[in-house]
A protein has these predicted regions:
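Zn2+-dependent peptidoglycan hydrolase active-site motif and core
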Residues: 43-78
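Conserved positions in beta-strands of structured domains
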Residues: 11, 48-50, 78, 95-98
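Extracytoplasmic/periplasmic cell wall- or extracellular glycan-interacting regions that localize
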Residues: 1-51, 56, 119, 125-128
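Surface-exposed strand-loop junctions at beta-sheet edges and helix termini
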Residues: 35, 44, 82-83, 88-89
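Conserved, short, structured surface segments that act as functional micro-motifs
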Residues: 62-63, 84-128
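Feature marks short, surface-exposed loop/turn motifs that line or immediately flank catalytic pockets
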Residues: 18, 70, 116
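Short, acidic/hydrophobic/Gly-rich beta-strand patch recurrent on exposed beta strands
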Residues: 22-25, 31-34, 61-66, 109-111
């Protein structure tokens, strides 16, 4: 099981969900974790940072390549603490939470991908 990327409560789940702002149904490819502003975002496993910048709709984003086609994505950050090409270790602080996405509250949007396919992070994260 993987460690959690941030302490907080899951407020939006993987799969088909009603969007709180647009009142439509969307297929969520990750989860939203409500956290205190400025909470440290931690890499869930070792890897190489392949993206760390603004992405429309996601705000400040960090994407880590964990090899063998496995990626993690961390969005809505208020601050990025890493850069493209940097090798990170499990548990390393890579950013701080914020509200730079479209949700309008302080959350971390967290996604796991196996190849091009999103997978439910809650199936991979340690139970708590």
């Amino acid at each position: 099981m993987l460690p959690w990327p941030v302490e907080g409560k899951v407020v939006s789940f993987f799969g088909r969900q009603k969007h709180p702002t647009f009142d439509t149904y969307v297929q969520r490819k990750g989860i939203e974790i409500r956290a205190s502003e400025g909470s440290l975002i931690h890499a869930v496993m070792p890897g190489s940072v392949v993206y760390s910048d603004w992405l429309k709709g996601y705000g400040l984003v960090i994407i880590v390549d964990h090899a063998n086609g496995f990626f993690s994505l961390y969005a809505h950050a208020s601050k990025i603490l890493t850069r493209v090409g940097e090798q990170v270790v499990e548990g390393q602080a890579i950013g701080e939470t914020g509200d730079t996405g479209m949700i309008g509250e302080n959350t971390l949007y967290f996604e796991l991908r196996e190849g091009a396919e999103p997978v439910d992070p809650l199936q991979w994260l340690a139970k708590r």
